[in-house]
Design a protein with these regions (language model features):
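Cys-nucleophile CN-hydrolase/nitrilase-fold catalytic domain and related Cys-dependent amidase chemistry
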Residues: 19, 24-106, 110-112, 182-202
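A conserved C-terminal secondary-structure "cap"
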Residues: 257-277
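CN hydrolase (nitrilase-like) catalytic-core segments centered on the catalytic cysteine
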Residues: 65-84, 159-249
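Active-site-proximal beta-strand elements of phosphoester/diester hydrolases
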Residues: 5-17, 43, 99, 149-158, ...
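Short beta->alpha transition motifs characteristic of CBS
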Residues: 57, 101, 112-119, 230, ...
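Active-site catalytic loop in hydrolytic enzyme cores
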Residues: 91-171, 184-193, 197, 255, ...
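Short beta-strand scaffold segments in enzyme catalytic cores
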Residues: 85, 99-102, 142-144, 229-231, ...
Length: 277
């Protein structure tokens, strides 16, 4: 049976190019979350365990046998919660993917979604970014189940491609996770607008955990990310947003009744005219 409500901790990080430092930050944030709250799902941002700070830098690929997943599995069991790692550089059949990972309250570690749309862009006046130099493209959407809630997955740049979210809408997901590491320039212009649009058009909750702040790496690299981790309801209302720079979290309670209310008022699923294609 599906739970009527789902309590989520939407976590913001300032990850760097050092796994141990990032893992310590995740542990500290979990400790802070569970001091006063009992979320059933904790969501972390894209690149939570390793963030490349210098373009062209070699990214380490992790396998599920790595000790860091064992540690995160222990934490998931300890706190009796689902941990959603927004993305990690994961080796799958010898190839590197920017992949989400779900860790269940029983400690099971599951690679789930591989980022489909890779960030190969050239902003005016800035250096080119080519994510595809490091990663392979994922091939398909994915839907998780958390206590009966159907959860679609996307990662960062995916948010610009409405067709992915249209697929999730047609499958009537309850929630879409969009972990990210947005640039400041694109974040200021597009972050809020895109995420609210995706929630409204899919008539589902959208929870976007972000990297935010100034990242100073152990190898001398630096980077700025936009932050503004945000939770949005199916009507497009902002339930919570982290407006300060740096690590933090926001707790939100998602209601199945709210999803049903929105879909009853505006029954989009009966009005669709174009096929998926």
């Amino acid at each position: 049976m599906s739970a009527a409500e789902l309590v989520i901790a939407n976590v913001q990080m300032t990850s760097i190019d050092d796994v141990d430092t990032n893992l310590m930050q995740m542990e500290s944030l979990l400790e802070r979350v569970f001091e006063k709250h009992q979320p059933r799902l904790v969501t972390f941002p894209e690149n939570c365990l390793y963030l490349r700070l210098t373009e062209g830098e070699k990214i380490p690929g992790f396998e599920l046998s790595h000790s860091l997943f064992s540690r995160l599995s222990e934490l998931s069991v300890q706190y009796k919660t689902y941990l959603h790692l927004g993305s990690v550089p994961l080796l799958i059949e010898g190839h590197l993917y920017n992949s989400s990972v779900l860790i269940t309250p029983s400690g099971q570690v599951q690679p789930t979604y591989q980022k489909m749309h890779l960030f190969d862009i050239q902003l005016e006046g800035q250096k080119a970014i080519r994510e595809s130099d490091a990663f392979r493209h994922g091939q398909k959407p994915n839907i998780l189940e958390v206590d009966g809630w159907r959860v679609g997955e996307a990662i960062c740049y995916d948010v610009r491609f409405a067709e992915l979210f249209s697929q999730y809408a047609r499958k009537e997901v309850d929630l879409i996770l969009v972990p990210a590491a947005f640039l400041v320039k694109t974040g200021e212009a597009h972050w809020n607008i895109l995420l609210r649009a995706r929630a409204i058009e899919s008539q589902s909750y959208v929870v976007a955990s972000a990297q935010g702040g100034t990242h100073r790496g152990v190898r001398g690299g630096t980077r700025e990310t936009y932050g503004h981790s945000i939770s949005i309801d199916p009507w497009g209302n902002i339930l919570g947003e982290i407006t300060q720079s740096g690590p933090g979290f926001v707790i939100n309670t998602l209601s199945r009744q709210q999803i049903e209310n929105v879909r009853k008022q505006i029954p989009m699923k009966y009005h669709r005219r174009l096929p998926v294609g």
